Amino acid sequence: MAEKEHYVRTKPHVNIGTIGHVDHGKTTLTAAITTVLAEKGLAKAEDYSQIDAAPEEKERGITINTAHVEYETENRHYAHMDAPGHADYIKNMITGAAQMDGAILVVAATDGPMPQTREHILLARQVGVNYIVVFLNKCDLVDDPELIDLVEMEVRDLLTEYDYPGDDIPVVRGSALKALQGDKEAQDQIMKLMDIVDEYIPTPERQTDKPFLMPVEDVFTITGRGTVASGRIDRGTVKVGDEVEIVGLVDKVLKSVVTGLEMFHKTLDLGEAGDNVGVLLRGVDRDQVVRGQVLAAPGSIQTHKKFKAQVYVLKKDEGGRHTPFFSDYRPQFYFHTTDITGEIELPEGTEMVMPGDNTEFTVTLIKPAAIEKGTKFTIREGGRTVGAGQVTEILD
């Protein structure tokens, strides 16, 4: 294994991403940001096809995988996640959106807010993305500035509806494509957007003092070195030599020791909350750790099957169910990075739950999950998101 370049932490690190309706320009904007910042020596220009390159992409013409690019502004280092736009692939948005300290909501001025605009705002709210900046894209294609004003008002109203400060949220107008093509004015708007992101999205208070927890997103083997689990550190810190537990999906807790750590393909001394890292685990076989489990500080989190939850059930126009559900309903609960089937028991006096309801009920999972009070999840059936919520009380 060749000596890796060492990742040096000099600027505060922030995770952001692009969200919004399919074809409104999320990936084009991501490419434009890297291109404009590259001219200042703060990024490597990534072209659209690089960011958009996911094997499934070519077959169906829709973005499926979550792309991560990195860049810097004068003030910060960013990891930027390009959230998939298509409703069928909201599953990846769920793993992705959970990775954001703030989001850039991309809305095409030619269209205004669309169903997935609403869906992504809702998901951002549910997975704890507290700061959104708006980029009104394709403004060059709208002749009447009053129409753009109208779209901006609609977007602000929609954000307010989901408890964001719609009146105060910064809105930048521009054209990602023109910026990508080198138009000076369009590029200035991209710089303005990044200045606003720098200022409006606060440097997150990292949860570095809490016990280490990292949901496992991917597992792979490095020949001759062992098994690597990768994901975003949820809280705490990790370094080589630390003892960790692999928790979830099975009753038995597996213990291991961290023997290597890297980020952005560079070795890392200390991984901390918010970092996307690969953790090399001693004495663990490739099949002993799977997506959906968590790596955790010993004794810090247990597995549970039964809990109480506060849940928002999506309305039909948000892509949710058309009909109510009752006790004994058995959907999938998407925790951390995986689906687990669970049975719902409604509280006494509640006969059914309607789309659009905000409700509380008890869940019994068929497999143990590494959860605690405050753990967020989404509810899915047949591949579509029908609800979102969080654990309010552990019952077993």
Curated annotation (Swiss-Prot):
The keyword GTP-binding applies. PROSITE patterns: G_TR_1, G_TR_2. It is found in: Cytoplasm. Residues 82-85 are annotated as: G3. Mg(2+) binds at residue 27. It is an enzyme of class 3 (hydrolase). Its EC number is 3.6.5.3. It comes from the Bacteria. SUPFAM superfamilies: EF-Tu/eEF-1alpha/eIF2-gamma C-terminal domain (SSF50465), P-loop containing nucleoside triphosphate hydrolases (SSF52540), Translation proteins (SSF50447). Residues 20-27 are annotated as: G1. Residues 175-177 are annotated as: G5. One of its GO terms (molecular function) is translation elongation factor activity. Residues 137-140 are annotated as: G4. One of its GO terms (cellular component) is cytosol. Residues 61-65 are annotated as: G2. Residues 11-205 form the tr-type G domain. GTP binds at residues 20-27, 82-86, 137-140. Keywords: Cytoplasm, Elongation factor, GTP-binding, Hydrolase, Magnesium, Metal-binding, Nucleotide-binding, Protein biosynthesis. It catalyses: GTP + H2O = GDP + phosphate + H(+). HAMAP family: EF_Tu_B (MF_00118_B). Belongs to the TRAFAC class translation factor GTPase superfamily. Classic translation factor GTPase family. EF-Tu/EF-1A subfamily. Monomer. GTP hydrolase that promotes the GTP-dependent binding of aminoacyl-tRNA to the A-site of ribosomes during protein biosynthesis. This is Elongation factor Tu.
